[in-house]
Amino acid sequence: MQCLSIIAKSIGSKLSPHLSQIIPALNRLSEGLREDESIDEDNELAETALSTLEAIIRKCPLEVNDYIADMVSRSFELCAYDPNYQYNDDEDDEEMKDDEEDDGEGWGDEDFSDDGMPEDDDDTSWKVRRSSVAIIDAVVRTRPDRVKGIIAQYADTLIDRVKERIDDVKVEILNTFQGIIKSSMEVKESSLELDLKAQSSI
């Protein structure tokens, strides 16, 4: 797996003749996650598989055309994979109000262990979320033609993930928003250019 990941990131275009075997295998490796528990070994394997898929998309954006829809769908599912944490918007709002009202004494103590690290510091599920978002980013940046469909189908899901609790993942999400905006502008500019050419030829 590590060798395949290195090859995909360096000379991924060479893998194009074998994508029909490679992509389904990588998809299977990223699907072995338990919904009720975060297991480090499974997370590491899924992260490697997803990172390899991301590299393949960036190196072979046209060759993966038949697989993009499934990869995007799966990535949006995995970008919310956080079995050890329960998000509660109402509680978050209350906590923000409490933080604004206190003087900072005892700030965040309940969220940290004795050594000052977050209690869930050993939870590696964030690596799966970050890698899955990176796949979405790879698609929107290399396949601008897919952006409109992604926005129509998954915009609400991606916006909801801004609540992500891990900074590394949140940065990847914001980068993806940036990629969506950039690719959308490129598509509009291309369409405008085609319209102008069509009008000038009349």
Regions found by a protein language model. Give the residues of each.
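Karyopherin-beta/Importin-beta family HEAT-repeat alpha-solenoid scaffold
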Residues: M1-I202
